Design a protein with these regions (language model features):
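Conserved catalytic core of two-component sensor histidine kinases
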Residues: 50
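N-terminal helix-turn-helix DNA-binding core of bacterial DNA-binding proteins
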Residues: 2, 7-47, 70-85
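Beta-hairpin "wing" of winged helix-turn-helix
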Residues: 57-68, 72-75
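Short, hydrophobic-biased segments on the C-terminal half of alpha helices
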Residues: 53-54
Length: 113
């Protein structure tokens, strides 16, 4: 059985894996933008921008509303909060593991008396 939360997290992390999409998220954090406005800083075609927008939409990070021919995009940060919670859940584990590794390295690098 597939857990829908993990499926959505997969989409979120996939969306965040691209620098262009992360930059689009940063722009959307300041407010609503058209797809053309999102594309402009990257000197990409409208078609390329639409592909990025669709990835963000699938991840639930972007909401799109259509007004006439214009597509307006806005940020939905809820999936980012879920991804952050997932990462935080493992933060203690990795911190403990790195502390143990540091301790081991200190012990093995001491000169013998």
């Amino acid at each position: 059985m597939v857990d829908d939360r993990h499926t959505n997290l997969d989409e979120v992390f996939h969306a965040l894996a691209d620098t262009t999409r992360r930059a689009m998220i940063v722009r959307l954090a300041s407010g609503e933008h058209t797809v053309g406005e999102l594309a402009r800083p990257f000197e990409m075609s409208l078609n390329a921008a639409v592909k990025h927008v669709k990835v963000l939409e699938r991840a639930g990070l972007l909401r799109r509303r259509v007004q006439g021919r214009a597509h307006f995009c806005s940020l939905d940060a809820r999936p980012l909060k879920e991804a952050a919670a997932f990462v935080r859940a493992y933060e203690g584990f990795w911190s403990d593991r790195l502390d143990a590794l540091d301790s081991l390295l200190r012990q093995t690098s001491r000169p013998e008396s």
